[in-house]
Amino acid sequence: FTPKPGTGAYSRVGAAGPTTAQTASVQGKPCAVCGATDPKMVADHKDPLVVEHYRTGSNDINKQTSTSAVQPHCRKCSSSQGGQASVFSRAMKRILGL
């Protein structure tokens, strides 16, 4: 993965979701990773915000707030992905010299 040259450090944009509609859309569905179900599922962006940011240089808020942009995650898989995203973000900062 090569980040878009000139991209600044990622800072999560709250407006990118998950929105109430996105969260509602994943309830009662199995986790896209492990198949588990939790009483409250997490709306996971199919294209993680941090990845989109370093690939394109920004986040497409309209795309990322649509219900089709998310998939269900259980809490365990969501937490695991959060750690992976943090490692990814640090690597992108090193590559970009940030």
Which ranges hold each PLM region?
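Catalytic toxin/effector domains delivered as secreted proteins or via bacterial secretion systems
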Residues: 1-98
